[in-house]
């Protein structure tokens, strides 16, 4: 059966990322991995201060003022050693993350997609590089619906007879792409194009649930916009091109 389908050219080819694209993905994913571990260490230091009743009067415990506070701490062992070791590890992670981000910025300047992506609300160097690396070749998606489905940001649909029940998002597809789009949506939520709709959804569904739903909705809108931008090689526009099936704004 498979041989017959292949002979008739009815078996779709499997798309594989190039070695260069795999390298780009690895760099952006490694950065996210380091950022995650840095956040864990920072939270651990904050937890140690709270456990011993130390107040943190500054907004950034790891800025200049916070470092002076940490240097003067009088903790019992082993907590003091753990806090100092955590600070050293955070400094090392800061250095490594900075190196990766500088590489991403240098490489992204000549990338075919990243400068276009950065014209959209909420997308900077890091997010743009992550989204571009995870999407790969935009021509493998025949429509914005296909790209949105690939991201896993579409709701699950359970069908029974003539009844369709929609659940949470499917989370199919690369989680790093989903992270990049959600990160962009959070930053774009204050943009004039999206702010009113975003706030309206939050008020309608409640602050906590409404914020998450509004972010997912905005991430899907940005995904649609990204498909048009990369397919037509044009910067972000507030509205879809003539003849498009939907608006690009929320």
Place the predicted regions along the sequence by residue:
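Short helix-capping/linker segments at secondary-structure and domain boundaries
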Residues: 9-12, 41-42, 97-98, 136-140, ...
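Short, amphipathic alpha-helical segments that act as regulatory/interfacial helices
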Residues: 3-6, 28-31, 35-38, 42-50, ...
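Short alpha-helix plus adjacent loop in nuclease-associated cores
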Residues: 1-22, 26, 33, 66-72, ...
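Short coil/turn segments at secondary-structure boundaries
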Residues: 16-17, 47-50, 58-63, 104, ...
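Basic, amphipathic alpha-helical segments enriched in Lys/Arg and hydrophobic/aromatic residues
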Residues: 205-250
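Phosphate-backbone recognition surface of nucleic-acid-processing proteins
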Residues: 116-119, 125, 130-211, 246-249
């Amino acid at each position: 059966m498979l041989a017959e389908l292949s002979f008739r050219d009815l078996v779709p080819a499997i798309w594989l990322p190039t070695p260069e694209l795999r390298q780009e993905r690895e760099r952006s994913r490694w950065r996210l991995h380091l950022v995650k571990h840095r956040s864990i260490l920072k939270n651990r230091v904050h937890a140690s201060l709270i456990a011993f009743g130390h107040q943190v009067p500054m907004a950034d415990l790891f800025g200049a003022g916070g470092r002076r506070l940490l240097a003067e701490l009088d903790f019992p062992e082993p907590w003091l050693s753990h806090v100092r070791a955590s600070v050293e590890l955070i400094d090392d992670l800061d250095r490594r993350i900075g190196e990766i981000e500088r590489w991403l910025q240098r490489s992204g300047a000549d990338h075919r997609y990243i400068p276009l992506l950065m014209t959209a609300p909420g997308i900077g160097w890091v997010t743009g590089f992550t989204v571009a690396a995870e999407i790969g070749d935009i021509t493998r998606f025949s429509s914005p619906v296909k790209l949105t489905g690939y991201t896993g940001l579409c709701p699950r649909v359970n069908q029974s007879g003539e009844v369709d029940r929609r659940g949470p998002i499917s989370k199919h597809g690369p989680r790093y792409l989903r992270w990049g789009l959600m990160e962009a949506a959070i930053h774009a939520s204050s943009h004039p194009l999206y702010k009113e709709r975003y706030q309206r959804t939050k008020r309608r569904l409640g602050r906590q649930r409404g914020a998450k739903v509004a972010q997912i909705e905005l991430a899907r809108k940005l995904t649609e916009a990204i498909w048009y931008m990369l397919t037509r090689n044009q910067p972000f526009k507030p509205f879809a091109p003539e003849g498009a099936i939907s608006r690009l704004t929320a």
